[in-house]
Amino acid sequence: MRRLFVVLSLFVVAKAFGQEDDRKNTIYLNFTNRVIFNDAFIIGYERVLKPNRTFTVNIGTISLPRFTDKSNNDSVQLLGGSGNKGFHFSADYRFYLSKENKYEAPRGVYLGPYYAFNYAERANQWNLNTSTFTGGVNTKMSLSIHTVGLQFGYQFVVWDRLALDFALLGPGLGVYNIKASINTNLSEDQKELFYEKLNSFMAEKIPGYDRVIDEGEFNNKGSTNTTSFGYRYMINIGYRF
């Protein structure tokens, strides 16, 4: 009986370790983008390809922060938002450093290339009161960011199932496009009032906005396209299976 118990115990342990080795998949919930974008909901998936290599993909919805008007300018008054939407997609290829890690992927130190795309837009309603125009104006603000870079991170695995993923450092090159549209025929001076307003909102709500966006060009034209420094920092909590 004792021998049978020992044999069964060894079988269960061997099966448990075998299941652990077979866990090549992890699903994630991203907690980082909520700091920058409102109502962000992003899920991810990581697949082990080789003992020290994996591929991840992330997809979800994002939105620009809600605009708030704190100025005392009676000429342009924000009435409220009328809609917002956004989309996130990113992917990366990870090399888990076998010389630095005790375990195989997806545990330990990793580095590798990544690509990320974010698009968000927000519509707002305004009241404009000038000597030549009085009435309601609708605007739409859109922001798109393409980023390519190299990331460095560390992933913990707790209780064989829970994954804590930290992309600690992710410098890259970003292509930023921001555009504002107005649905009413206004003079150039009147349009600039809105462009300046929208620009100040974005600078207030989005960290690092003023470092990559040409505010002068946007204030004059209502749009700007620039290539500048990009960055990725990410925290995921996942489940392995």
Whereabouts are the PLM-identified features?
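Structural signature of outer-membrane beta-barrel channels/translocons
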Residues: 46-48, 94-100, 153-157, 238-240
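Transmembrane beta-strand segments that form the barrel wall of outer-membrane beta-barrel proteins
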Residues: 21-41, 54-63
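Transmembrane beta-strands of outer-membrane beta-barrel proteins
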Residues: 25-29, 55-59, 89, 107-115, ...
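Transmembrane beta-strands of outer-membrane beta-barrel pores
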Residues: 31-35, 59-65, 95-97, 115-121, ...
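Short loop/turn motifs that connect adjacent beta-strands in outer-membrane beta-barrel proteins
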Residues: 19-24, 51-52, 98-108, 158-164
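Outer-membrane beta-barrel "beta-signal"
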Residues: 90, 94, 227-241
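Extracellular/periplasm-exposed beta-strand and loop segments of Gram-negative cell-envelope proteins
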Residues: 30-32, 64-88, 120-145, 173-228
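Bacterial Sec-dependent N-terminal signal peptides
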Residues: 1-23, 237-241
